[in-house]
Amino acid sequence: MSKVKVSIEGSQETLWKIFHAEVNEMIVTKNGRKLFPKLEYIVEGLDENKLYAIMLQLQPVGESRFKFSGGKWQETGKAEKQVDAKKMWHADGVRKGSDWMWSSICFDRVKISNYSESNNASMIYLNSMHKYIPVLTIYESPSESPFCVPQSSNQIVATAKFPHTEFIAVTAYQNQKITDLKIKHNSFAKGFRDGNLSRKRRSPSYSDGSNSQSPSPKSRSPPEVAPLQSMPPINPFLFYFPHMLSENLPVQFPFAFPFLSPLPSTPSSSSSELSIVKEEDQEVEEDIDIVG
């Protein structure tokens, strides 16, 4: 009997259970959307010196289509014909057991889409309003070449799926509770399409505690700069001699006496600090879609 143990990473495990209590939903789009919570696994019990490859699939659950009605999900008719679940091999390829067990194994590059014609290798096609469950499979590999991916079923070391990672694929969130949870727990979730939340994350104004009146960086006019003081013309026939200068007067350059060609004084900068709204360089997830 295999001693291999697979579990969900602690913080993600907690999130999956929170979402599962309300029947989790995942947005599918033509361009693909990443899963949240993340699929991040911990694997124990592998042979440290043997080679393994790890594969993820999103398998259909049941044979029904679902709809959200009366504040809850319910089955409504037969499911559409499902294609074979796409095999997503982990990007790390074939590695020793010691390497796989060194840290968590995350499938954060996977995206789900409702566009069946996509050729994107990281995209998985799902039918909207159908339920799916992630399934992790660990294969023993005869070669360390990342292109030698094992396929035969007799090389399977372990398979793991967790009921609380089930979700229904949707094109827009149906349950307001799920919408609220996504906003609360996903730092990149950007709110509603009605514009209540800004699409860009901004830091507050430096000049006061409120940024409600702060203009955007694109609309801010540049600060006015005081013109430089004009310098009197230099007489090329006047040359200074050091012994003629007062000890308290600075030596001027290039050709005039200090009192004939004073240097312009440097304008002092304003002590007041400009109010700035700064765009953070941060990857932003698409808007949260909701019904209606």
From Swiss-Prot:
Residues 204-223, 265-275 have a biased composition (Low complexity). InterPro entries: p53-like_TF_DNA-bd_sf (IPR008967), T-box_DNA-bd (IPR046360), T-box_sf (IPR036960), TF_T-box (IPR001699), TF_T-box_CS (IPR018186). Residues 192-227, 265-292 are annotated as: Disordered. Keywords: Developmental protein, DNA-binding, Nucleus, Transcription, Transcription regulation. It is found in: Nucleus. Disruption phenotype: RNAi-mediated knockdown causes about 5% embryonic lethality with 1-10% of hatching larvae displaying posterior morphological defects. Defective intercalation of dorsal hypodermis. Simultaneous RNAi-mediated knockdown of tbx-8 causes at least 48% of embryos to fail to hatch and those that do display severe morphological defects and die as larvae. Simultaneous RNAi-mediated knockdown of tbx-8 abolishes muscle expression of vab-7. RNAi-mediated knockdown at the larval L1 stage causes a decrease in expression of lin-39 at the larval L3 stage. The keyword Transcription applies. One of its GO terms (molecular function) is DNA-binding transcription factor activity, RNA polymerase II-specific. It comes from the Eukaryota. It holds the Pfam family T-box. GO terms for biological process: cell fate specification; embryonic body morphogenesis; positive regulation of DNA-templated transcription; regulation of DNA-templated transcription; regulation of transcription by RNA polymerase II. Residues 10-194 bind DNA. Residues 280-292 have a biased composition (Acidic residues). One of its GO terms (cellular component) is nucleus. Transcription factor. Involved in the control of early morphogenesis of the intestine, hypodermis and body-wall muscle. Involved in regulating expression of vab-7. Appears to have partially redundant function to tbx-8. Positively modulates expression of homeobox protein lin-39, perhaps by binding to regulatory regions of the lin-39 gene, acting in the vulval lineage. This is T-box transcription factor tbx-9. It comes from Caenorhabditis elegans.
